[in-house]
UniProtKB/Swiss-Prot annotation:
Identification of the protein by name: GTP-dependent dephospho-CoA kinase
Membrane-spanning residues: none
GO MF annotations, alphabetized: GTP binding; kinase activity
Keywords from the UniProt entry: Coenzyme A biosynthesis, GTP-binding, Kinase, Nucleotide-binding, Transferase
InterPro entries hit by this protein: GTP-dep_dephospho-CoA_kin (IPR007164)
Summary of the function given for this chain in its UniProt record: Catalyzes the GTP-dependent phosphorylation of the 3'-hydroxyl group of dephosphocoenzyme A to form coenzyme A (CoA).
Pathway involvement of the protein, from the record: Cofactor biosynthesis; coenzyme A biosynthesis
GTP-binding is among the record's keywords: yes
Coiled coil spans: none
Cystine pairs: none
Amino acid sequence: MIYKLTPALRDDLKTPFGTLYPGKGESCLAKVVKALDKPPKIISIGDVTTFYLIKAGVVPDMCLVDDQTMRLPVDHEVRKGTSHHTFKELRVSNPAGVVTQALMDLIKDNMSSTEPVRIFVDGEEDLAVIPACLYAPIGSAVIYGQPNEGVVVVRVTEEKRKETKALLDKMERVDE
C-alpha cells in the first residue's frame, strides 16, 4: 500500500504538527535540546535537523535522511555529520509525496531497537513524520525541520497518534 499526499492535505501539512522552535542551525537546535527532557525515544527527520542534533551532542534513537535539503543535495559536511559510529544503517525507497508500506514497516520494526538506527531514504523522507508519530512510544519526541521557519518537536501522545492516523486516513491509497 502507498499513501499519497493530496493537494488539500499538502496545504494542511504546511502548519507545524507540534511546537515550532524558530530559527536555524545550532542556536535553534540548542533550544530544542534544552527542551527535550529525556523522552523515551528521539526520532529526527531530515538531514540538516539530524546534523545539528548530533552536533549538539544528541544522537537520535532513529533518524531518517535522504542526502537532500529542500530538494537540493546537502553538502559533504552535513552528509558526513548525519552518520555516527553507533548507528545501525538501513535503507528504504520512498518517493516524494508518499508514504510507502516499506517505510512504515521499517520504522515500526526498528522503533524498539536498542541501538540507534539511521534510515537512508531513496527518494524523500519528509512524510516519515507520520509513521514516526504512529509507532514511537508515548512521550517520545519526533523532530523535523519546518522550511524557512525553524524546527518542530512533536511530542507523541495518544491524541497526537489519533491526529496522525486521521492524516493517514485522508491520504489517497494506491496499491503498490
